Amino acid sequence: MNKKYVDTIILRLYYGKICKRGGFMSRRKKIVITLILILVLLPAALMGFLYYKINTIKTDNQVEGITNILLLGTDGRKNESAYRSDCMMIVTIDNTHNSIKLTSLARDTYVDIPGVGMGKLNASYFWGKDQLLFKTIKNEFGIEIEKFIQVDFEGLMDVITALGGVDVEISKKEMEAVNKSVPSTYESYDNPDKGEMKLIPGDGVQTLTGYQAISYCRIRDIDSAIYRDARQRKVIMAIASKFKSMPVSSYDDLIKTLSPCVTTNIGTIELLNMAKNSYEILQKGDSIKQGEFPIIDEVHSKGGKYKKAGWVWRYDTNSVVVLKQFIFDDVDMKNNKYLNETDKIKLNG
């Protein structure tokens, strides 16, 4: 690939229009780096260009220690009056242990929402957006988070459509559940490129369209919200995998597609440093470590209707140590010693 073409791509994707007085980076450049963090896996070709530019410009100091970013997937459907946080994941850039982690927080976790009372975790976003959600997470789990990246599901459908679909392995039950909701999702999806409505033909590895993938992310009736969280992580990983296989010439259009549906409070230089750090960690060969909370093992949590909160997950308050040790000490959640100490279980509420 000749240098002139490379420089043109970098200029178009990363610099855009630069303010003469402030010299700050364009929204498009910020969206590129945000996309990288959202997808976690940091596509090699894109990062190759970005890494080259980072090493030729001056950025802030190296990010040290552990950085937690709250990744929010908001689902404000057309027939609903307000947005709710349908997907909550903590993206951890761990420079202490050289690892990247993706931890799902179940939206139905029973928590004490400051100023509101007991309810579901995702209700804190409904009542006070990201700031109240930050407070709730800090009070309940002892994890202080100040940075967030928010993506709405409608926009995520556009990204998957632009990618030509994503490959996801699904079970027969999942396929049947998705096909039940596909017609309504398709009908409400306002995109001229969505094509004719199609159902998923079978189980196994299937290439899902945008509306099929989001229907897949939403299903929960066949199992529980915990499995739903796992499905959401699978789709994110599938998007990342597909993104890596796309030609560099398509990045510009993909970024334009994603841009309207992304919101973040992270500054551009900070995003650059995070992206560079994440890339360096993943270059060492470690894969993304995944976790989820509450711990669903019929011992450290209990699911069901509770008081006036509806269907919730009550969790063992002492099991928060498993979550914190995974994020801060890099201790595998499934092999944490606390899980054997059943005499200390104390359900909240």
Which residue stretches match the model-derived regions?
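Extracytoplasmic
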Residues: E64-T67, Y83-M88, H97-L105, V116, ...
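Entry/capping segment at the start of metal-dependent catalytic domains
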Residues: R27-S99, K276-S278
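Soluble non-cytosolic domains of exported or imported proteins
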Residues: S81-R84, G115, S124-L132, Q150-E154, ...
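Second-shell loop/turn segments in exported
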Residues: G76-N79, G119-W127, G142-K147, R218-Y227, ...
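Amphipathic, coiled-coil-like alpha-helical scaffolding segments used for oligomerization/assembly
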Residues: W127-P192, S245, N265-G267, L271
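Flexible, polar/acidic helix-loop-strand segments at domain edges
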Residues: S81, T161-D253
